[in-house]
Design a protein with these regions (language model features):
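ATP/NTP-dependent adenylation/nucleotidyl-transfer catalytic domains that generate, transfer
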Residues: 1-30, 35-54, 82-83, 190-330
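ATP-dependent adenylation/nucleotidyltransferase module used to activate substrates
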Residues: 3-181, 185-192, 197, 201, ...
């Protein structure tokens, strides 16, 4: 590969085909952190003195995000910077989540970061395994169902942790996959909600995505080079539904045309910005919401997705929900 195109001193380790850079391992790590720092600055994601909740699952993306944000907070100029809190959700996937949660706890202990953990069982009265026990004959994907509950769980953890902003580890691949899926589903309204920095007028916590401009492959390499122990096994439910097909298609496109994901990302941001300005959201990235008729949480419709999904689960599962959960849904 030759010498590093950045420092010119060490042998190159990784080539970014979309930019032509051939980087040594240290320069790759440094430029990845710099890219995240620029993204945070570009979208005004974080402010000094804020309490930042980092959604940490135990996978490569979330652990890398936690380490990068911790690094950006470190050093002699760290006074007045963000205070980090890890927000971890236990979905209840037997044989999978225990390892990831252990990795999350390990990095939090190493970095001295507070951790707040919530579970589906405590919040909704059932685990993800229980919720999906009935789903074999239905068209709804596991990821769609889990996503609804996971977003609510992170919100609940954020409130308990009293944070000002939640940082999630969605990378560039996640972003363009979601953009493509919304296009394929004809969901124009959701396209207006894809801003890397969003807020709801009825919810006090902002949501930001600092890894938005980093390829998934590069996040994985950063985690490897940083010697971050993370769960490499995929969720047993992740290969269901449209997202898996979209992921494979975009990866094939990128392999043939390096940089295509960056082009799609720029297009997605342009569409999101235009829809926001055209009034499909309240201001820059703010969603228009109403209180859910059942739980009172902010919702884009009369009844929120969590309440609708919970009712579906209770109607089809083979277990009896706890009395407390039934009372909360009424």
């Amino acid at each position: 590969m030759g010498d590093c195109s950045r420092c010119g001193e060490r042998p190159s380790y990784y080539t970014r085909r979309y930019s032509g850079e051939s980087l040594c391992a240290p320069c790759f790590q440094e430029t990845t952190v710099e890219k995240v720092k620029r993204t945070i600055s570009k979208y005004g994601m974080l402010r000094r003195g804020e309490r930042v909740g980092v959604a940490v699952s135990g996978g490569k993306d979330s652990l890398s995000l936690l380490k990068i944000l911790h690094e950006l907070n470190a050093g002699p100029s760290s006074s007045g910077r963000s205070e980090l809190v890890a927000l971890t959700v236990d979905e209840g996937v037997k044989g999978y989540r225990d390892e990831a949660i252990e990795h999350a706890r390990g990095l939090c202990d190493e970095l001295g970061v507070e951790q707040v953990t919530v579970s589906y069982s405590d919040l909704f009265g059932f685990s993800l395994d229980q919720a999906l026990d009935w789903k074999d004959d239905r068209e709804l994907s596991s990821c769609s169902m889990c996503g609804v509950f996971r977003r609510r769980a992170i919100d609940e953890a954020a409130v308990r942790a009293k944070v000002d902003v939640v940082a999630t580890a969605h990378n560039l691949d996640d972003y363009v996959q979601t953009f493509m899926m919304n296009l394929l589903h004809g969901d124009v309204e959701r396209l207006a909600w894809l801003d890397p920095s969003t807020y709801d007028a009825d919810f006090p916590v902002r949501r930001v995505k600092p890894l938005t401009e980093v390829y998934e492959e590069e996040v994985a390499l950063y985690a490897f080079l940083s010697k971050i122990p993370f769960q490499s096994a995929s969720c047993p439910y992740m290969h269901e539904g449209l997202r898996s097909e979209v992921r494979d298609y975009l990866n094939e496109l990128e392999s043939k045309h390096p940089g295509m994901k960056n082009v799609l990302m720029a297009s997605a941001l342009g569409v999101t910005s235009r829809l926001s300005k055209d009034g499909r959201s309240d201001g820059a990235g703010a969603k228009t919401t109403v209180p859910c008729a059942k739980c009172g949480k902010p919702s884009s419709k009369g009844v929120c997705g969590v309440c609708r999904m919970t009712q579906i689960v209770w109607q089809h599962t083979k277990f009896v929900p706890s009395p407390a959960s039934v009372r909360e849904s009424s």
